[in-house]
Amino acid sequence: KYGDKSVYFDLEDIGNTTGQWDLYGSDAPSPYSXLQ
């Protein structure tokens, strides 16, 4: 795992991953969940 939160976007921790979403410019975890 690469820092967990950096790679895995948990719905429970979506508050913490919000910053990550900005980097991707996406609000939906769908495309990224598929990659994971």
Swiss-Prot record:
Keywords: Chloroplast, Membrane, Photosynthesis, Photosystem I, Plastid, Thylakoid, Transmembrane. GO terms for cellular component: chloroplast thylakoid membrane; photosystem I reaction center. It comes from the Eukaryota. It is a single-pass membrane protein. It is found in: Plastid, Chloroplast thylakoid membrane. Pfam families: PSI_PsaH. Possible role could be the docking of the LHC I antenna complex to the core complex. This is Photosystem I reaction center subunit VI. It comes from Pisum sativum.
